[in-house]
Amino acid sequence: QMGLAENQLTSDLVEDWILNNPEASICTPEGINDFRAIANFQDYHGLAEFRNAVAKFMARTRGNRITFDPDRIVMSGGATGAHEVTAFCLADPGEAFLVPIPYYPGFDRDLRWRTGVKLVPVMCDSSNNFVLTKEALEDAYEKAREDNIRVKGLLITNPSNPLGTIMDRKTLRTVVSFINEKRIHLVCDEIYAATVFSQPGFISIAEILEDETDIECDRNLVHIVYSLSKDMGFPGFRVGIIYSYNDAVVNCARKMSSFGLVSTQTQYLLASMLNDDEFVERFLAESAKRLAQRFRVFTGGLAKVGIKCLQSNAGLFVWMDLRQLLKKPTFDSETELWKVIIHEVKINVSPGYSFHCTEPGWFRVCFA
């Protein structure tokens, strides 16, 4: 199974922590005394200690170069729920978000299915290693206007899924300047923030807001979606985070989050874990070390048989280039090759067309 972006490399560290901290769970003899308090109705905005712990963890995964206000954190059922709530808050049916391609296929579900919002692709290709440019943003924006589609925002994923790359400071400055010029919102999916395993390091959009004082930036237009699914390896816990600099969005998202709450038991356990500074420090360091080692082994093995990947340093996957194996440079040929990999090689990988890539022959392969 190399088609799911799961981080299973550090499960043992979490298991050891739970064994050594049984009082963190209300389902153990050591924690049972708190059962009634936790099992009853709680603040729908989330436990204060959990929001504080998440704010501290978000700062830690960004090198403690910035801080986050716990009162601006809104809980949701995973990043899926967080994205949908954000879309409901920012756009009406028929309005659109620009999204650089290739992008995570789940965005088509998260942002479109129930909201009626459209996604307009921003063209990025291998000629410059899929780097987002001002020209591509302008082209997508103008194309939407020509089609009578009102653009309400830009959605970026940093680090990128499926590319495994990070956006540098120059690109992030371009993004901020663009959304301010167009007066549209910016939604930054940063759920892979702590999966960077080599230099250059991750730069959060929050850092741009703090540091780049020479460019115009209306904070009311900026929103971050985060999760513990990838950085901590907890996709089953369904912990999604919306962090908005816009008071109206925070208030609206809080009301909507009532339909997708994070269980209090989960909050209680994770608050204790994330407040263990020694564990978090050790966990993040070991996670980066293991991701780097797995990345080197996997890409090294591919290189030995002549298969290249896009140069990357983050995420739980590589963007594998199999264009030379296509019978023809078409998506039909890509599908044919994908079926061979699935049915004959017996490996589940994801074809590039599922990420809306415009170039046949690219595949996402998860290695963690």
Swiss-Prot record:
Pathway this chain belongs to: Alkene biosynthesis; ethylene biosynthesis via S-adenosyl-L-methionine; ethylene from S-adenosyl-L-methionine: step 1/2
InterPro entries listed in its UniProt record: Aminotransferase_I/II_large (IPR004839), Ethylene_sulfur-biosynth (IPR050478), NHTrfase_class1_PyrdxlP-BS (IPR004838), PyrdxlP-dep_Trfase (IPR015424), PyrdxlP-dep_Trfase_major (IPR015421), PyrdxlP-dep_Trfase_small (IPR015422)
UniProt keyword terms in alphabetical order: Ethylene biosynthesis, Fruit ripening, Lyase, Pyridoxal phosphate, S-adenosyl-L-methionine
Source organism superkingdom: Eukaryota
Cofactor(s) this protein requires: pyridoxal 5'-phosphate
Main EC class the enzyme belongs to: lyase
Entry keyword annotation includes S-adenosyl-L-methionine: yes
GO terms classed as biological process: ethylene biosynthetic process; fruit ripening
GO molecular function: 1-aminocyclopropane-1-carboxylate synthase activity; pyridoxal phosphate binding; transaminase activity
Induction text: Hormones, such as auxin, environmental factors, such as mechanical wounding and a number of chemicals.
Residues with PTM N6-(pyridoxal phosphate)lysine: 230
Enzyme Commission code: 4.4.1.14
Catalysed reactions listed for this entry: S-adenosyl-L-methionine = 1-aminocyclopropane-1-carboxylate + S-methyl-5'-thioadenosine + H(+)
Stated role: Catalyzes the formation of 1-aminocyclopropane-1-carboxylate, a direct precursor of ethylene in higher plants.
Record-stated family: Belongs to the class-I pyridoxal-phosphate-dependent aminotransferase family.
PANTHER family in the cross-refs: 1-AMINOCYCLOPROPANE-1-CARBOXYLATE SYNTHASE 6, BIFUNCTIONAL ASPARTATE AMINOTRANSFERASE AND GLUTAMATE/ASPARTATE-PREPHENATE AMINOTRANSFERASE-RELATED
Subunit details: Homodimer.
Protein name: 1-aminocyclopropane-1-carboxylate synthase
Gene name in the database record: ACS5
